[in-house]
Design a protein with these regions (language model features):
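Conserved alpha-helix/loop element of class I SAM-dependent methyltransferases that forms part
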Residues: 29, 46-63
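A short glycine-rich, Lys/Arg-flanked "PGG" loop and its adjoining helix->strand segment in the class I
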Residues: 151-166
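N-terminal auxiliary segments of SAM/dcSAM-dependent transferases
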Residues: 1-23
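Class I SAM-dependent methyltransferase SAM/SAH-binding core
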Residues: 66-127
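Conserved catalytic loop of SAM-dependent methyltransferase domains
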Residues: 215-240
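Short, glycine-/aromatic-enriched active-site segment of Class I SAM-dependent methyltransferases
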Residues: 173-195
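Short alpha-helix
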Residues: 197-213
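A short acidic, Gly/Pro-enriched loop at the edge of an enzyme's catalytic core
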Residues: 126-138
């Protein structure tokens, strides 16, 4: 496991940081939230839920879907799926054992009530501990920036998707493969400097999905609905000159963007 991932999601427990109120640990999709008024915790939680909803809509789920979430964290998204996606069956997978224990503790009542609809398993995106052809959808929300090998992730996604199943991923990537991008981001953002986030172009993921045999690969920029709201929320704790505020600057300078990437397993 990447040491930065181990520490951030283990002893440091990023979910306890108030910038991630509600425990979803994503930057949020802010389109439906008025950014011209003071933001509160309810807005923040909704932004994170709405990012999941964008991904789930893009997954075009069938009735009673079986869904795998890669990088489930505390499982807040898994619980949202159970409440909003009909009779969904959800497997939440995460590489970090401490995160999985927190997920099981957080959702202990739900696991008792719905033992056949929700489970949490430990596994890496590049080597998923689940059977092939087992899922109608594979989703991932703001985790792919940590994955060490996008090609292996794509191959595993293809392996576990049923014919006609869909993949839907949301995360941030560089806008292109210019050789200077990693250095630019490391100079702006501590999470790239310390190796927690990996600077790669979104096209690398798209090509990996195509190479793994998936069809209809589509890349959509959703940064306009992510970065301004995220920066407004960060401004409650971080001054303009501090490094977290550089996410918006990296977007405005055309270095980094936030994407929704989808693909389908041919029938």
């Amino acid at each position: 496991m990447n040491p930065a991932v181990r520490d951030t999601y283990g002893p440091a427990d990023l979910s306890n940081n108030p910038v991630f109120a509600g425990g979803f640990i994503n930057f949020g999709h802010w389109q439906a939230i008025d950014l011209d008024r003071p933001l509160d915790e309810a807005d923040r939680i909704r932004s994170q839920q709405d990012l999941y909803r964008q991904v789930l809509r893009a997954a075009a789920l069938p009735d009673e879907p079986e869904i795998l979430e890669v990088g489930c964290g505390l499982g807040m998204g898994c619980a949202l799926m159970l409440s909003e996606c009909g009779r969904a069956t959800v497997t939440g997978m995460d590489i970090h054992p401490e995160q999985l224990q927190r997920a099981r503790d957080t959702h202990a009542d739900l696991l008792r009530r719905e033992p056949d609809r929700l489970r949490f398993v430990r596994g890496a995106a590049e080597r998923m501990p689940v059977a092939g052809d087992g899922f109608d959808a594979v989703i991932s929300v703001e985790a792919a920036q940590h994955f060490s090998d996008l090609r292996a992730f794509a191959e595993e996604t293809s392996r576990v998707l049923r014919p006609g199943g869909r993949a839907a991923f949301a995360s941030f990537f560089t806008v292109d493969g210019a050789p200077g991008r990693p250095g630019e981001l490391a100079a702006l953002l501590d999470t790239f400097a310390n190796g927690l986030d990996i600077a790669r172009p979104v096209q690398q993921l798209a090509d990996a999905l195509t190479g793994a045999g998936l069809a209809g690969v589509h890349v959509e920029s959703i940064g306009r609905h992510v970065w301004p709201g995220w920066d407004r929320w960060l401004s409650r704790w971080w001054a303009p000159e501090t490094w977290p505020r550089n996410f918006l600057r990296a977007y405005e300078r055309g270095i980094l963007d936030y994407y929704l990437v989808t693909a389908e397993q041919p029938r």
